[in-house]
Amino acid sequence: MWSDIETSKDLLGYSIHASLLKDVITNPKNLPITVGLYGDWGSGKSSILKILQEQLEKDDDTVVVYFDGWSFENFDDAKMALIQGIVDALESNEKFFAKVKDDAKGAMDAVTEAFVKLKKSINWMRMLKFTTKAALPVASAVISGGASIIPTLISVFQENKEHLTDILTGDKAEEFLQNAINSEDNEKKYKAVREFRTDFEALINKSKQGRIVILIDDLDRCLPRHIIDNLEAIKLFLNVPKTAFVIAADQYIVSNAIKSEYKTIIEASKEDRHHDNLGEAYMEKFIQLPYILPKLSPKEVETYVTLLFCQSALNEQDFFKSTKRFHLICE
């Protein structure tokens, strides 16, 4: 019986996918970027992330952090949990400090102080109750464009929701959004988002690292609301220069989760010819590069099973030779 967990041992020739993704996210011209690694459950997404992680960790200019999206499932405030988790992971990552630890004492202190400031910002945002549905959509609209959060805004501003899409995509979009953030409460939240983004970008620059890569697995196993929360947290708070996110998920499950979360909106806008594609359109606003894994052919499945039997029958040295020959043949 074989283990049903991810592995960095490449028996399927998936290193080519990891290498292609590495080339994309290590190119400074492409950053910031969010990549969607799409495939069915059991298609090998998690293994590709592990292989990619190993490749990236060999790069002196890259700090990589791996997250299981499901690990935040028990938190009510999924947005803040993800942000806190990423900040904590960077703070505990020795490589993040590697380029400043031998510099003058001031450089190391600057990074440490930046972490303290970010943590205070997170606590402040928790106090502002960013879990409420109005604040983040409005701030997101101003930062990343109104159309990207139309579904959320419709769920918040129930009045005139039939006309909200037209308002946000028309000539009066800027005026509408500005009026929406003019309340004192939303003004504080909008300012907090801006300050966090500025401080997070400053932290990365002070570390002197070339890029920060966040690998997020199993997003599609989260509850629909948490799937959306995680995507919005990445786009709104963390998508700053020198960052790359690779999110492994079944795109159809994520899309259906979005449709499920906003099913009342879809019902209310049936006359809109775009409502059937709401899930896909919503995802496109967060994912710049969709990378879809091809399904295995029967021949590839046969080869994989053969290699599994070889792995169980051969010692480690002989099996390594066998897989090396296999990869040479594939090339």
Q: Positions of the model-derived regions?
A:
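Conserved AAA+ ATPase small/helical "lid" subdomain
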Residues: 103-132, 283-331
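Conserved Walker B catalytic segment
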Residues: 186-194, 198-256, 261-263
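Conserved nucleotide-binding/hydrolysis micro-motifs of P-loop NTPases
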Residues: 41-43, 71-75, 250-255, 263, ...
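Short glycine-/polar-rich loops that comprise or flank the Walker A/P-loop
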Residues: 32, 60-63, 210, 240-244, ...
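Short secondary-structure boundary/capping segments
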Residues: 52, 81-86, 229-231, 260-267, ...
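P-loop NTPase nucleotide-binding core
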Residues: 56-201, 206, 270-271, 314-316
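Walker A/P-loop-proximal flanking segment of P-loop NTPase domains
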Residues: 1-80, 84-88, 203, 289, ...
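Short regulatory helix/loop adjacent to the ATP-binding pocket of P-loop NTPases
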Residues: 254-285
